[in-house]
């Protein structure tokens, strides 16, 4: 089973790392939106667990891991406390938000793809759920914060594409029986680096043909 590429301890640690980094990005956005402490916690939890909850419900992994492992619930609360007390320092580090988000994107797209395949889905469906695992929490985060989700906006740097690449790499490795801890890590790093490069060089997906690039919808 591909979900057992790593020892249970390593796999659980990677899951918590992904949850933590996504929760940080959600909590930081909540602070920028002037949410109270409860709102910060809610946005952190939703960002960290939303994509995984959707994946588990689709593949029939019920109850979802977020409801059976207390660590999955407590980790976003730890991120909430960290941001709540240290946000004046963290908020000045915009690159930190981007790095946290990119790291979570890479970790979740790989974990989501392998888990979906282990539950009997085909490679294409598994890759799609890997993408959903990676971006689902971010979409919910943006919606709750009253923002158009980043992956839907032309005037935002590539967000879904790096996750698509990472998920596709995992699916191809499974297809050719080449999925190992090394290739899984390579997929994580690829998605992570692509997201950071997109932020650095402002890579964006094309809009409808003949749509004037100078026209940007209101924020």
From Swiss-Prot:
Organism: Streptomyces coelicolor (strain ATCC BAA-471 / A3(2) / M145)
InterPro entries, per the entry: Gly_transporter
Gene Ontology cellular component annotations, sorted alphabetically: plasma membrane
Membrane topology: Multi-pass membrane protein
Protein name per its UniProtKB record: UPF0126 membrane protein SCO5481
Similarity comment: family membership: Belongs to the UPF0126 family.
Keywords: Cell membrane, Membrane, Transmembrane, Transmembrane helix
Keyword Transmembrane among UniProt keywords: yes
TM segment ranges: 10-30, 34-54, 66-86, 93-113, 120-140, 158-178
Any Pfam family the entry gives: Gly_transporter
Localisation per UniProt entry: Cell membrane
């Amino acid at each position: 089973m591909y979900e057992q590429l790593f020892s249970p301890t390593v796999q659980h640690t990677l899951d918590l790392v992904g949850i933590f980094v996504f929760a940080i990005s959600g909590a930081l956005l909540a602070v920028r939106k002037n949410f109270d402490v409860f709102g910060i916690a809610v946005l952190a939890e939703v960002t960290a667990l939303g994509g995984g909850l959707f994946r588990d419900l689709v593949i029939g992994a019920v109850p979802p891991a977020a409801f059976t492992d207390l660590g999955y619930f407590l980790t976003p609360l730890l991120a909430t406390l960290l941001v709540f007390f240290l946000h004046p320092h963290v908020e000045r580090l915009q690159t930190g938000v981007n790095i946290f988000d990119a790291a979570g994107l890479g970790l979740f797209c790989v974990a989501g793809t392998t888990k979906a395949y282990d539950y009997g889905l085909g490679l294409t469906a598994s890759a799609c759920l890997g993408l959903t695992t990676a971006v689902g929490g971010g979409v919910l985060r943006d919606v709750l914060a009253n923002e158009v989700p980043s992956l839907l906006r032309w005037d935002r740097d590539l967000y879904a594409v790096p996750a698509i690449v990472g998920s596709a790499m995992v699916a191809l490795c499974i297809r050719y029986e080449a999925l190992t801890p090394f290739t899984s890590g390579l997929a994580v790093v690829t998605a992570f680096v692509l997201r950071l490069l997109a932020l650095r060089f402002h890579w964006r997906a094309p809009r409808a043909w003949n749509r004037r690039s100078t026209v940007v919808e209101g924020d």
